Amino acid sequence: MSSINLNLIMAFSLALMGVLIYRSHLMSTLLCLEGMMLSLFILMALLISHFHMFSASMAPLILLVFSACEAGVGLALLVKTSNNYGNDYVQNLNLLQC
């Protein structure tokens, strides 16, 4: 395994650990999710170019589009939560409340 792939896997693992550790605030969770998606995007692009799989060259761009949609929905949820409750705690996002 090359050092670039190892670094990207470590970046993904650190972002995943950040999601698990800093899950009390929505903003920190969203930042860690963006780090995970960015490391997946770079890893997919490098693997596709390394193995010359040009038929799958649109996969990283599709992942990037879904990442942008996820960020937009997450930021809208962050704005709505901070307007309603005054903070960005994840514990305020209870689905049982109407």
Curated annotation (Swiss-Prot):
GO terms for molecular function: NADH dehydrogenase (ubiquinone) activity. It is a multi-pass membrane protein. Disulfide bonds: none annotated. Pfam families: Oxidored_q2. The chain crosses the membrane at residues 1-21, 28-48, 59-79. It is an enzyme of class 7 (translocase). It is found in: Mitochondrion inner membrane. It catalyses: a ubiquinone + NADH + 5 H(+)(in) = a ubiquinol + NAD(+) + 4 H(+)(out). Its EC number is 7.1.1.2. This is NADH-ubiquinone oxidoreductase chain 4L. The gene is MT-ND4L.
